[in-house]
Amino acid sequence: SNSLYAQSIPPFKKGERVVFVGNSITHGGHYHSFVWLYYMTRFPNKPITIMNAGIGGESAWDIKDRLDYDVFDRKPTYVTLTFGMNDTGYDIFWKENAKELSEQRIEKSLESFREIEKRLLAENKMTKVLIGGSPYDETTKLNSLLFLHKNDAILKIIDAQRKAAKKNGWGFVDFNQPMVQISLEEQKKDSTFTFCRV
């Protein structure tokens, strides 16, 4: 399936107020600073405002609780949302009942996402884009303390995001699979290559 629904993701217009919502990957500011730089250098007569609503360590249930004051109160015309890395847990993947614990965390995440989805649907004057989160790298040889099957759990969350975007007519961009493909290619040359430092 197509990981990028470009036709449903309109470019930013002059005066657009864009809020990027997410976890530490958003909080770090890298990907949306590139978006801002692209628009600033190519469309200097169409200024936009980019606002970072990423908070490190957060999951969908945390994001749900701060939608009003951290997202909607900023009067955005455009909102992107990503989550999944923290939602899926970490050391649970080392436990004997990892599969069961993982399913519980995925369900908790998706339950919160359904609430977020309802709130976003009620805000009909803004463009919404869901971002399938970046991967957890299980194939790097950088270290041996890997959380096996963590990216599979992230992919289940991304699948729900993709379906919601399609159902609601929202944009969807998948960071996960393109980054996995690049990692696998680079690891053929250097087994310790990774984008993921968790």
Where is each model-derived feature located?
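Bacterial Sec-dependent N-terminal signal peptides
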Residues: 1-8
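Glycine-rich phosphate/diphosphate-binding loops that line cofactor/substrate pockets in enzymes
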Residues: 9-15
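Alpha-helical cap/lid subdomain in secreted, periplasmic
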Residues: 12, 33-49, 58-198
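Catalytic nucleophile-elbow at a beta strand-turn-alpha helix junction centered on a G-D-S/GDSL motif
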Residues: 16-30, 56-59
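A structural signal for the hydrophobic beta-strands that form the central parallel beta-sheet
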Residues: 20-21, 52, 130
